[in-house]
Amino acid sequence: MDEMATTQISKDELDELKEAFAKVDLNSNGFICDYELHELFKEANMPLPGYKVREIIQKLMLDGDRNKDGKISFDEFVYIFQEVKSSDIAKTFRKAINRKEGICALGGTSELSSEGTQHSYSEEEKYAFVNWINKALENDPDCRHVIPMNPNTDDLFKAVGDGIVLCKMINLSVPDTIDERAINKKKLTPFIIQENLNLALNSASAIGCHVVNIGAEDLRAGKPHLVLGLLWQIIKIGLFADIELSRNEALAALLRDGETLEELMKLSPEELLLRWANFHLENSGWQKINNFSADIKDSKAYFHLLNQIAPKGQKEGEPRIDINMSGFNETDDLKRAESMLQQADKLGCRQFVTPADVVSGNPKLNLAFVANLFNKYPALTKPENQDIDWTLLEGETREERTFRNWMNSLGVNPHVNHLYADLQDALVILQLYERIKVPVDWSKVNKPPYPKLGANMKKLENCNYAVELGKHPAKFSLVGIGGQDLNDGNQTLTLALVWQLMRRYTLNVLEDLGDGQKANDDIIVNWVNRTLSEAGKSTSIQSFKDKTISSSLAVVDLIDAIQPGCINYDLVKSGNLTEDDKHNNAKYAVSMARRIGARVYALPEDLVEVKPKMVMTVFACLMGRGMKRV
């Protein structure tokens, strides 16, 4: 780091800045580029017109990017805070960083005291999450030692320390992710707790949480901003699980005139929720809302939404619930919000927001409140008579979901909700290249917002660049794949590129551990067999297509060879196996691999069905874990 930037900066201040930098650097590539700045201002929810934000970002890039490489390095970031501190632009930048949820309280850097530097975190979020978790786990005997937590104290940060609550919440969001048999519930020594936290973090990663900056020690120490950040991701995945057309065909009722099902399927869960709320508001004769922050502060839209979705008692066995609208005319915003929440309580949906959260327009908690309303009372009817091609509504395949979760766990931006539609401008693919150490020249990349006219041309240019990078520096096999295919969302060809990205990522991890020695399938298979035989195990594998892998016994034995004694063989079935036996073995194997510290993205079914690509990633991750034993 250059001298000038560090002269008057203490170690604590530097740590604060590093943390702030990491929050803005969404793809964790060590640089901030302009689309990450756009995201920051979007999330900070600042009352600035779009043109003003664009001006600020241009100015920041102009002043901050001193070596003119189109991105801001950490040194340049420090320089902005040190040298440009007094300017209005830098003040706005600092305010945006402070407003982004879960970010440390950045003062004016040099004014920060080196002692007692405090990370700020959102009390509102803590309160909301504690109440949600208390309700979700109230009957779980394994959580009696910590549930119910007091939302007004720091109970939450202590409660997550042994990993059990986190594992349980992951399973509530994506059922069956973690095999309960792999969670340590008794005799919680520090080593056993470490294993639970490994299991929670690697499983969170496997369902698509971005956990790159979080370690088991952070959770054991209950670092508030990291705990809240992880919990929000886990809770949100659960809340959004059914806000997806293939899992909820009634959402087709939200189609607008002239809109195709394909277009509706491209919307993110957030966009679908907004569309859903507006569908009901329109039916009630109330004006539309554009967000779940400023537009809901007066609770009036919420009153109408509750009134529309409350059961009318017309279906058999459905009790009628009447919403009392008298609070609508209350003059005080807080009292009106309280009155609205009392009505939500009648529906069993008083969750996530307090009256103050509604009135302040907290975007995260209001989004959660609305998602929960949708999940309990969608109040939509699947359209019958329309000319709709329902065959489009096939859900994503397991492989597609695994790829998507892998990308999201690396913190790509924007978040990938739909594998093909969200890769059509190649921005995510270009970020993945950076993750596999293929340099990207961001000055060649077109970034959103794209112009109304010619938007697709801009996206296609990105796709062409992505294919070019794949052929040359990355040396992928991309025969017959062009930028147009990515831009069209061609499934087979997009998958071919994405698989090569994931494979390279997996092999890179091994090469880093093996001092740069090239890794390939044969090397992994040989290592697996050598490790098994040295540990006195009788299993072995011929290749990643070996049908014996479907019993998962080779995987289980390998885990036990890497960490002797960790497998409870009473839980493992051998001999003549039924499909159920195989599935139970695979489920245990995947969870145990994650528990000993392997970041496995594959699913138990991949082992049972011996899917060679995913099988390769399982053994490669275990080899990586095995090589760390030095």
Curated annotation (Swiss-Prot):
GO molecular function: actin filament binding; calcium ion binding; structural constituent of presynaptic actin cytoskeleton
Protein name as catalogued: Plastin-3
Effect of residue 229 to R: Found in a patient with X-linked osteogenesis imperfecta; uncertain significance
Modified residues (Phosphothreonine): 391
GO biological process terms held by the UniProt record: actin filament bundle assembly; actin filament network formation; bone development; regulation of synaptic vesicle cycle
Pfam families in the record: CH, EF-hand_7
Localisation: Cytoplasm
Residues the record lists as binding Ca(2+) 1: 25, 27, 29, 36
Region (Actin-binding 1): 109-382
High-level lineage: Eukaryota, Metazoa, Chordata, Craniata, Vertebrata
Domain annotation Calponin-homology (CH): ranges: 123-239, 267-378, 397-506, 518-627
EF-hand domain sequence ranges: 12-47, 52-87
Entry keywords, A to Z: Actin-binding, Calcium, Cytoplasm, Disease variant, Metal-binding, Osteoporosis, Phosphoprotein, Repeat
Quaternary structure note: Monomer.
PANTHER family given in the database record: FIMBRIN/PLASTIN, PLASTIN-3
Expression tissues: Expressed in a variety of organs, including muscle, brain, uterus and esophagus.
Binding of Ca(2+) 2, residues: 65, 67, 69, 71, 76
This protein's record includes keyword Phosphoprotein: yes
